[in-house]
Amino acid sequence: TELEFAWAFIDKCSLALTQGELSAEEAAMAKWWTTEFQKRAIDECLQLHGGYGYMNEYPISRLWRDGRVQSIYGGTTEIMKEIVGRNLGL
């Protein structure tokens, strides 16, 4: 459901990019949606591992750290929301 939506939207954006038609707003929406989805999904996985999820010996710890930074570099989620909001005239 959410994952399928993310894949479909990323496919649409990839096609638009290769055709030179990807707008900044669409790119911002894609980054915003997929990074927030990634954070929610990896948080649930971390929860399943309990305290082990925070130990560096387990891959889930690295995945959580890597997933968290996705919403920061390249423009924070808040900046992506600003870009989308400008397109909506807000």
Where are these regions (language model features)?
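Alpha-helical interface subdomain recognition
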Residues: 1-90
